[in-house]
């Protein structure tokens, strides 16, 4: 088994430089597994970097990005949808598993303000814009596809609502 630092480097490379979107998406799940392992490890071991502020400080700016193209070029949003859902689920997971100790600083006020202002707010605006467009175009010949997309947007909104309920901010 390699050290935490080596694994952190590998995740940084995967999330920042990997040219394959599906691999980036899958790496979020692997990253979450590492975090889960760190939180479940015995207390007598040295603390893992996977249960430390490094998660929020180094990886949040890498993981939680939005695109201005999403509202105007909807296909770009759908290309990123799986990644964004994985990222949102990772954030929700951190809010759940780090609630008692705040080892990652995920509950620090400035971190939550950043998350809301830089990511969640933009994602909500995008979701609302796309939903409105699909509701208007629901009579299209692509009605089934539109319905599936509306359902996916509702699922994303649901995860965001769960996140907001767990955040200590009043957003």
Functional labels for PLM-detected ranges:
Residues 4-107:
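Long alpha-helical HEAT/HEAT-like repeat alpha-solenoid scaffolds in very large eukaryotic proteins
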Residues 34, 84-86, 109-112, 144-145, ...:
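Residue-identity detector for glutamine
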Residues 1, 65-82, 132-150:
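Acidic, Ser/Thr- and Gly/Pro-rich intrinsically disordered linkers and low-complexity segments
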Residues 121-171:
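Eukaryote-biased recognition of C-terminal alpha-helical segments
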